[in-house]
C-alpha cells in the first residue's frame, strides 16, 4: 500500500520531507499535493538549490500549479485555511507550517478529505505524540491528529529509552546546543522572545525548550524526570543534546556505551546511530538518524552521575521520521 500525502507548508521541513521521500527511493509513500502561499516558481527553486543540503538529487520542473520531481506532477495550491484545502483522495495531511499546532487547528485538514493529520511540531491536545522507533507501535486507528514531536525530542527519546531500560534514569537535565532556525532574525529585530530577537549568526543565545519534558509524552515512565534548556548557536544546521542524569544504580562508561551500541545495531537501527570518531557538527549534516550517540563523550562520576552527548541533523533526521511515522499511521487506515 502506498500512502498518499499532502504537505501543508513548504518551508524547511516541508521541502526536506519531500526530498527525504525521493532520496530514499521509498515507494510506500507518495506526495500528491503541496499547499504553500509562496510562488510555485520560488518553491521549486528553493527545492532545487538548498544552502544546507545541496542540490536536489533529481530534476525539478514546475508550472503554474504543479511541481515535478521525477515522479509525476504534484498539485500545488495557495490556500490559507486548511479547512478549504482540496484533500479528496489524500490519506495523510502533513501539517508543516508551524502555525496549526493545536489539535483543533490541525484537525481542519480532516474536513475536506484528509483521513489523518501528522503535525511536524509539538501539538497541544494531539491524539498521540510519536517518536518513531520509540513508541510508534502504540498508534491506533483512532489517532486522527498525531504530533511528530520536535527534532530535539526525537534525538533525546531513543537515548533516554535505551538508558532507562538498561540502568534507569532517576532524574536528568538536558541542554541542546541548537543551530539557529527560521524564526530567528539575521539582524536584531522584534520578537516575542527577547533572546530570539537578537541576530542569530552573531551570538550564542540561551532560550527555552519543552523537548525534555515532552519525553514524558512518549515514555510515560519518564514523565517529570527530565527538563532542559536550549542554547541557539551560529551554525545553520546540526544540533547536539548534552544530557546529565542520575542513574538509578551504579554504572560505568562501558555499560552505557554497550547498551547504546546494542540498540543502534538492533531494534533502533536507522533511528539511533553511534560514532567512535572525533567528529564535529558538520560531520552529521544530512545524517538521516534521529540521534547519533558520541561514544567517547560519555562520562560517569561516582557510579551514578552520567553525562552523554548525542548529535542530530535537526532538519534531515526529523524529516525522515515524518515519512516513517506517516507510513506507520497509513498502515492503520
Curated annotation (Swiss-Prot):
SMART domains cross-referenced by the UniProt entry: Gp_dh_N
Gene Ontology terms for molecular function: glyceraldehyde-3-phosphate dehydrogenase (NAD+) (phosphorylating) activity; NAD binding; NADP binding
Pathway as given in its UniProt record: Carbohydrate degradation; glycolysis; pyruvate from D-glyceraldehyde 3-phosphate: step 1/5
Binding-site residues, D-glyceraldehyde 3-phosphate: 150-152, 181, 196, 209-210, 232
Localization annotation: Cytoplasm
Site feature location: Activates thiol group during catalysis: 178
Annotated Gene3D superfamilies: Dihydrodipicolinate Reductase, domain 2, NAD(P)-binding Rossmann-like Domain
Enzyme class of the recorded protein, top EC level: oxidoreductase
Catalytic residues of the enzyme: 151
Location (main, coarse): cytoplasm
UniProt keyword terms in alphabetical order: Cytoplasm, Glycolysis, NAD, Nucleotide-binding, Oxidoreductase
PROSITE patterns: GAPDH (PS00071)
A GO CC term attached to the entry: cytoplasm
Reactions catalysed according to its record: D-glyceraldehyde 3-phosphate + phosphate + NAD(+) = (2R)-3-phospho-glyceroyl phosphate + NADH + H(+)
Enzyme Commission number: 1.2.1.12
Pfam family of the protein (one): Gp_dh_C
One GO process term, biological-process aspect: glycolytic process
Annotated NAD(+) binding sites: 12-13, 36, 80, 120, 314
Family statement drawn from the similarity comment of this UniProt entry: Belongs to the glyceraldehyde-3-phosphate dehydrogenase family.
Biological role: Catalyzes the oxidative phosphorylation of glyceraldehyde 3-phosphate (G3P) to 1,3-bisphosphoglycerate (BPG) using the cofactor NAD. The first reaction step involves the formation of a hemiacetal intermediate between G3P and a cysteine residue, and this hemiacetal intermediate is then oxidized to a thioester, with concomitant reduction of NAD to NADH. The reduced NADH is then exchanged with the second NAD, and the thioester is attacked by a nucleophilic inorganic phosphate to produce BPG.
Note, other: This protein is encoded within the form II ribulose-bisphosphate carboxylase operon.
Xref: NCBIfam families: GAPDH-I
Entry protein name: Glyceraldehyde-3-phosphate dehydrogenase
Source organism of this protein record: Cereibacter sphaeroides (Rhodobacter sphaeroides)
Gene name of the record: gapB
Amino acid at each position: 500500500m502506498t500512502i498518499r500525502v499532502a504537505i501543508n507548508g513548504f518551508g524547511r521541513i516541508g521541502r526536506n520531507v519531500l526530498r527525504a521521500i525521493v532520496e530514499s527511493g521509498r515507494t510506500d509513500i507518495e506526495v500528491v499535493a503541496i499547499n504553500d502561499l509562496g510562488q510555485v516558481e520560488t518553491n521549486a527553486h528553493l527545492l532545487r538549490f538548498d544552502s544546507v543540503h545541496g542540490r536536489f538529487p533529481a530534476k525539478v520542473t514546475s508550472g503554474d500549479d504543479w511541481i515535478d520531481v521525477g515522479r509525476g506532477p504534484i498539485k500545488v495550491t495557495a490556500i490559507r485555511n486548511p479547512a478549504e484545502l482540496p484533500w479528496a483522495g489524500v490519506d495523510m495531511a502533513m501539517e508543516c507550517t508551524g502555525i496549526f499546532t493545536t489539535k483543533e487547528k490541525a484537525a481542519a485538514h480532516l474536513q475536506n478529505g484528509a483521513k489523518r493529520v501528522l503535525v511536524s511540531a509539538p501539538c497541544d491536545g494531539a491524539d498521540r505524540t510519536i517518536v518513531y522507533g520509540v513508541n510508534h507501535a502504540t498508534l491506533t486507528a483512532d489517532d486522527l491528529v498525531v504530533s511528530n514531536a520536535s527534532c530535539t525530542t526525537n534525538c533525546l527519546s531513543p537515548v533516554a529509552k535505551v538508558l532507562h531500560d538498561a540502568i534507569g534514569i532517576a532524574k536528568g537535565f538536558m541542554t541542546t546546543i541548537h543551530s539557529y532556525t527560521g524564526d530567528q532574525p539575521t539582524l536584531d529585530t522584534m520578537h516575542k522572545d527577547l533572546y530570539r530577537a537578537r541576530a542569530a549568526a552573531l551570538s550564542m543565545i540561551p532560550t527555552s525548550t519543552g523537548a525534555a519534558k515532552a519525553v514524558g509524552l512518549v515514555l510515560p515512565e519518564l514523565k517529570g524526570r527530565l527538563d532542559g534548556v536550549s542554547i541557539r548557536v551560529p551554525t545553520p544546521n546540526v544540533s547536539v543534546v548534552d544530557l546529565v542524569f542520575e542513574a538509578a544504580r551504579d554504572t560505568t562508561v562501558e555499560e552505557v556505551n554497550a547498551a547504546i551500541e546494542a540498540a543502534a545495531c538492533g531494534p533502533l537501527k536507522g533511528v539511533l546511530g553511534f560514532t567512535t570518531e572525533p567528529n564535529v557538527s558538520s560531520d552529521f549534516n544530512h545524517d538521516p538518524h534521529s540521534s547519533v550517540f558520541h561514544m567517547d563523550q560519555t562520562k560517569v562520576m561516582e557510579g551514578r552521575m552520567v553525562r552523554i552527548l548525542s548529535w542530530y541533523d535537526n532538519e534531515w533526521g526529523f524529516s525522515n521520521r515524518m515519512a516513517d511515522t506517516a507510513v506507520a499511521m497509513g498502515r492503520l487506515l
